From Swiss-Prot:
GO terms for cellular component: cytoplasm. This is 3-ketoacyl-CoA thiolase. Belongs to the thiolase-like superfamily. Thiolase family. It catalyses: an acyl-CoA + acetyl-CoA = a 3-oxoacyl-CoA + CoA. Keywords: Acyltransferase, Cytoplasm, Fatty acid metabolism, Lipid degradation, Lipid metabolism, Transferase. Heterotetramer of two alpha chains (FadB) and two beta chains (FadA). The gene is fadA. Pathway: Lipid metabolism; fatty acid beta-oxidation. Its EC number is 2.3.1.16. InterPro entries: FadA, Thiolase, Thiolase-like, Thiolase-like_sf_Thiolase, Thiolase_acyl_enz_int_AS, Thiolase_AS, Thiolase_C, Thiolase_CS. Catalyzes the final step of fatty acid oxidation in which acetyl-CoA is released and the CoA ester of a fatty acid two carbons shorter is formed. GO terms for biological process: fatty acid beta-oxidation; phenylacetate catabolic process. The active site is at C91 (acyl-thioester intermediate), H343 (proton acceptor), C373 (proton acceptor).
Amino acid sequence: MKQAVIVDCIRTPMGRSKAGVFRNVRAETLSAELMKGLLLRNPQLDPNLIEDVIWGCVQQTLEQGFNIARNASLLAGIPKTAGAVTVNRLCGSSMDAIHQAARAIMTGMGDTFIIGGVEHMGHVPMSHGVDFHPGLANNVAKASGMMGLTAEMLGKLHGITREQQDAFAVRSHQRAYAATVEGRFAKEIYGIEGHDANGALIKVLQDEVIRPETTMESLAALRPVFDPVNGTVTAGTSSALSDGASAMLIMEESKARALGLPIRARIRSMAVAGCDAAIMGYGPVPATQKALARAGITVADLDVIELNEAFAAQSLPCVKDLGLADVVDDKINLNGGAIALGHPLGCSGARISTTLINLMEDKDATLGLATMCIGLGQGIATVFERV
């Protein structure tokens, strides 16, 4: 079987969704700039070799509608001979794009793919136009479409306290801020034009949503937002609302080597799994277990892990049941996570994978895992191996 490898991976800075730096920048532009960036960073690649552009996006309407993958690829000047498709596995969309490209390469259906994802949550809110079929209530809990309430349920089932959630959130902001100050995001962030608070055009080079001033005391003052009476999940322990995109150049290994392109990581295994929609945040557990089994390794073999932080109340049960509670500070989300950086839905899968690969390089690590939960009860996971 042919091998799929990551040649390059980049992301935009994460912009605040409410009056943030990308308030005047469209989702197609965020996407197109990264597509162009991959080609500029890898001049050995003839763009005419691109088989397909596979782009994750959840809210496929307004500026994100009508196949944003094709719209953005045309905007970027990708040759018209390349295909383009937009995929939607909710929060796991751009990780699913990774999987689709990898499967195509492994089965000989192409050897050069640009993948990624985008979500401009300031322009197209998560709830825009959502209309669940009333019959779903016959099969799943009525609150299953309310992500915050699923986090409340999962946290309660696993005895996760408010204090544990607050501490996890503080850690996310501290780690992300330290990574910013120390330049650890510099290799993955691709500067995009935006506007400052006064409306001046600027090159955005850093994430906007990190709150380094976050403390246990400031979080303790916040009220539960999803279950005001009995809940523990607050805005501060939930992923921030942000706008952003991420992108990867994925190729067949021998083709990349023939062109003299760098091989940053190999895709070792992939998996998706389902779980009860009422505790959708638990999805990373069965998905990770599948991916590890397919790779022929155990969780102890992993050097670095990126677990998408949809909610602290969701992440902590996954950490516990994957047997990772004792290695959080050594292996998991070492540069912070979505609580600090935000979770632009269609962007996040390739974003956490990009961060993971950079961390693996920084730490000279061999094996890494990127995994995330998905609304309505799914999980997705990818094991990467440096070569």
